[in-house]
Design a protein with these regions (language model features):
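Short, solvent-exposed loop/turn and secondary-structure capping segments
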Residues: 47-53, 84, 91-94, 105-108, ...
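Catalytic metal-binding/acid-base residues of hydrolase active sites
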Residues: 44-45, 100-101, 166-167, 260
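Loop/turn elements at helix/coil->beta-strand transitions in domains of secreted/extracellular proteins
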Residues: 33-36, 75-80, 156-160, 249-255
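Conserved small/polar residues in nucleotide/adenosyl-binding loops
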Residues: 304-309
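Formylglycine-dependent
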Residues: 111-159, 166-253, 259-268, 277, ...
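Active-site-proximal N-terminal segment of extracellular/periplasmic enzymes that hydrolyze or transfer
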Residues: 24-77, 166
Length: 310
């Protein structure tokens, strides 16, 4: 093909053939672009897994069961000295814009517009920071403006899916909506960084009239209200549906799977609770362990059931 393209004018009758070959080659290049799944876990400690992130297993590694993390590590690469901010918003704002917290200056968690979330300190004065989060467009005070890599993927032919926790911008700012960042599909993502409830029986933080009981109510999962479906599982089911739908499109996909787990509250996932109680854990310890294993099960479901890499 390259030889034909080097001499496009040498043989006029071959021009159509050359163009067809070029178009075919472009299609093949598109087909070779990989599908991408980025799996984000919230508030997870480096020892809160059965996969050691040190030279040997720690006592905490022996408590938890995350077989799918182990499987993924064997198939790929581990970064045992990587850094993430200790608070949700800075990490997620860094991820979406490609800038570190020292640059975007979202140094604490965001929620309500023009409202700082710092605790008062008797000694230290907290410097001004971007408490409205990040955005792709100017016009909002105390906001870092940056380009989303998701938008770049979308602009280059990717089908983009957001599932779970967003937490990029404060309420009533452009950045609160995952669509603003280039996601074509948004499942349960909004401004809040936490959740009111993991439980379908509690409508994930909505009352019987369908109204949220707090700003932390998880949106968009009404079909699971009143069921025993843990929110981690509900998000996984919806992500798989979105991926199966994406199979019909002649384009690669990007899925940002951002579980609310393991953020508080420590609601127990009944599927795994008894196992950890038998290990001698307290109620809170066992509930925390179930959040971890539920997250790992979600990872396994995506590894086993997502469309094959392109």
């Amino acid at each position: 093909m390259n030889k034909k393209l080097l001499f496009p004018l040498a043989l006029v009758p071959l021009a159509v053939t050359s163009l067809q070959a070029q178009k075919s080659a472009q299609t093949q290049r598109v087909d070779k672009r990989p599908n991408i799944i980025l799996f984000m876990v919230d508030d997870m400690g480096w020892q809160d897994t059965s996969l050691p992130f040190w030279t040997q297993k720690t006592d905490y590694n022996k408590l938890y069961e995350t077989p799918n993390m182990e499987r993924l590590a064997k198939q790929g690469m581990m970064f045992t000295q990587a850094y993430a901010s200790s608070i949700s918003s800075p990490t997620r704002c860094s991820l979406i814009t490609g800038t570190n917290a020292a640059r975007h200056r979202v140094t604490n968690w965001t929620l309500q517009k023009n409202t700082k979330t710092d605790r008062k300190d008797k000694v230290l004065d907290v410097p001004d920071w971007n408490y409205n989060g990040v955005s792709q467009v100017p016009g909002t005070n105390n906001t870092f403006v940056g380009t989303s890599f998701v938008q770049l993927l979308k602009d280059n032919g990717y089908h983009t899916i957001h599932c779970g926790k967003a937490h990029f911008g404060a309420i009533d700012t452009p950045g609160e909506d995952p669509h603003h960042w280039g996601f074509e599909v948004n499942i349960a993502g909004h401004a809040a960084g936490g959740l009111a409830s993991y439980l379908g029986e509690e409508n994930y933080g909505h009352n019987k009239d369908g109204k949220p009981i707090s700003l932390m109510a998880v949106p968009g999962l009404e079909k699971y209200w009143g069921t025993e479906t843990f929110v981690t599982e509900a998000l996984t089911l919806e992500a798989i549906k979105a991926l199966n739908k994406a199979k019909k499109y002649n384009q690669p996909f990007y899925l940002y799977m951002s579980q609310y787990a393991i953020h508080v509250p420590l609601d127990k996932d009944k599927r795994f609770y008894d196992k950890y109680k038998k290990k001698g854990m307290t109620d809170h310890e066992a509930a925390y362990a179930t959040l971890i294993e539920g997250m790992d099960k979600s990872l396994g479901c995506l590894l086993y059931t997502s469309p094959s890499p392109r």
